[in-house]
From Swiss-Prot:
Subunit structure: The avian keratins (F-ker, S-ker, C-ker and B-ker) are a complex mixture of very similar polypeptides.
Tagged with keyword Cytoplasm: no
Protein name: Feather keratin B-4
Lineage: Eukaryota, Metazoa, Chordata, Craniata, Vertebrata
Any Pfam family the entry gives: Keratin
Length: 95
């Protein structure tokens, strides 16, 4: 067969010396490789919301105290209170 070892060159010498090259070309082999199934995971959509508390035309100072208890600074620019009982015309409150 193609993969047999090279034949010895001539009669067996007293010393191991041989100058004949031993090269053998074998036929090409064909191997069919079936592709394995590939699972691709696509990330799902990221849903986010930005709720905003809105107080418009509040005349009560209780709104300011409730907001300050919840950690919302009154002087943040989104809410203004002009004195106790004063009118405040604000459009939005920071979250």
């Amino acid at each position: 067969s193609c993969y047999d070892l090279c034949q010895p060159c001539g009669p067996t010498p007293l010393a191991n010396s041989c100058n004949e090259p031993c090269v053998r070309q074998c036929q090409d082999s064909r191997v069919v490789i079936q592709p394995s199934p590939v699972v691709v995971t696509l990330p799902g959509p990221i849903l986010s919301s930005f709720p905003q508390n809105t107080a418009v035309g509040s005349t009560s100072a209780a709104v300011g105290s409730i907001l300050s208890e919840q950690g919302v600074p009154i002087s943040s620019g989104g809410f203004s209170l002009s004195g106790l009982g004063g009118r405040s015309y604000s459009r939005y409150l920071p979250c």
